[in-house]
Structure formats: structure tokens, C-alpha cells
Amino acid sequence: MCSYYHMKKRSVSGCNITIFAVMFSHLSAGKSPCGNQANVLCISRLEFVQYQS
């Protein structure tokens, strides 16, 4: 999972990784092996809306 954080620049394909990085840092703090960065994924915007609410 950690590799996704380093590959974020390559995964930019219609979604704003920067926003996900910020939001996930609050959502998944301490819940993943490598901390906040592990869950920084380019998920669909529909899923992102669900995470916001």
C-alpha cells in the first residue's frame, strides 16, 4: 500500500490526489501499516463523497 503514496504523481487520472491525501490523513490516521499515507488512493469521486459524509 505504501507504494501508492510514491506513485501518486503517476496515478493522477481525473482525481485530485492532493485532496485525497488531506482527507485520508484525517480518516485513516493510525489505522494503516504506514500511517496516513497508506490509504492515499485515487478512488472514484462517488466513493469520496461517501467518505465525506
Curated annotation (Swiss-Prot):
Main location: secreted
Cell location: Secreted
Domain of life of the organism encoding this protein: Eukaryota
Assigned keywords, A-Z: Secreted, Signal
UniProt key word Ligase: no
UniProt keyword Nucleotide-binding, yes or no: no
GO terms for cellular component: extracellular region
Coiled-coil regions listed: none
Signal peptide: 1-30
UniProt xrefs under PANTHER family: IGA-INDUCING PROTEIN HOMOLOG (PTHR39224:SF1)
Described purpose of this protein according to its UniProt entry: Enhances IgA secretion from B-cells stimulated via CD40.
Protein name as it appears in the record: IgA-inducing protein homolog
Source organism (scientific name): Homo sapiens (Human)
